[in-house]
Curated annotation (Swiss-Prot):
Cellular component, GO, one term: cytosolic small ribosomal subunit
GO BP term, pick one: translation
Family of this protein: Belongs to the universal ribosomal protein uS2 family.
PROSITE patterns found in the cross-reference section: RIBOSOMAL_S2_1
HAMAP family: Ribosomal_uS2_B (MF_00291_B)
Keywords associated with the record: Ribonucleoprotein, Ribosomal protein
Record-linked SUPFAM superfamilies: Ribosomal protein S2
Source organism of this protein record: Clostridium beijerinckii (strain ATCC 51743 / NCIMB 8052) (Clostridium acetobutylicum)
GO molecular function, one term: structural constituent of ribosome
Cited InterPro entries: Ribosomal_uS2, Ribosomal_uS2_bac/mit/plastid, Ribosomal_uS2_CS, Ribosomal_uS2_flav_dom_sf
Protein name per its UniProtKB record: Small ribosomal subunit protein uS2
Length: 233
């Protein structure tokens, strides 16, 4: 029994690729046919590749390592946040800031700043500050929360894998993963370069349902792996 069925993939529209003029020839092995100027992804390959990715992610989680979910495009933001939270993992769904992993000490400083402002709000400091100052601090807090809220408890040295929606959009994240030797699992559409990714899941990265289905499966893999880790203890 495969982790994702052909029926689920079809219903979520995972098979719809990009227009034929916007394609990467390296994706040819994953393309089934062309219909009305759009490439149709070979879902038998997706089933197989999703299984491989699932087993890898499960193993990473079982070893006690963390998985970082990354997807900043509109169609991915919600699923990335929800599934990372559900599986007790970390996420980036607004903007990948340069050095998020390769220069984590600087990022850590920004997270501390966020925590500092939050503390000021909680302990009543805001009540005694000038209104203008409070507005400025609230604006800064919102921006920091948007960009860093999903990685505030991240231990960058414990990231065992990165799950990405749309490697074309997240090329900076992939670059940092490469520098640090972190394997990348990704939903790869017909306009992407599969060679950038260690575990390719060929699929539609523009449909919310398709993204949600595959992202949820990766979260399931983490939860299954973590159960194994607890049992081993």
């Amino acid at each position: 029994m495969s982790v994702i069925s052909m029926k689920q993939l079809l219903e979520a529209g995972v098979h719809f690729g990009h227009q034929t003029r916007r394609w990467n020839p390296k994706m040819a092995p994953y393309i089934f046919t062309e219909r009305n100027g759009i490439y149709i992804i070979d879902l038998q390959k997706t089933v197989k590749k999703a299984e491989e990715a699932y087993n890898f992610v499960k193993q990473v989680a079982e070893e006690g390592k963390d998985i970082l979910f990354v997807g900043t495009k509109k169609q991915a933001q919600e699923a990335i946040q929800e599934e990372a939270i559900r599986s007790n993992m970390h996420f980036v769904n607004n903007r990948w800031l340069g050095g998020m992993l390769t220069n984590f000490s600087t990022i850590r400083g920004r997270i501390r700043k966020l925590e500092q402002i939050e503390k000021m709000q909680e302990d009543g400091t805001f009540d005694v500050l000038p209104k203008k100052e409070v507005i400025k601090l609230k604006g800064e807090m919102e921006k920091l929360e948007k960009n860093l809220g999903g990685i505030r408890n991240l231990d960058a040295s414990n990231v065992g894998a990165m799950f990405i929606v749309d490697p074309r959009k997240e090329k900076n994240a992939i670059l940092e993963a490469k520098i640090l030797g972190i394997p990348v699992v990704a939903i790869v559409d017909t306009n992407c370069d599969p060679e950038e990714v260690d575990y390719v899941i060929p699929g539609n990265d523009d449909a919310i349902r398709a993204v949600k289905l595959i992202t949820a499966k990766m979260a399931d893999a983490i939860m299954e792996g973590r159960q194994g880790e607890q049992l081993a203890e």
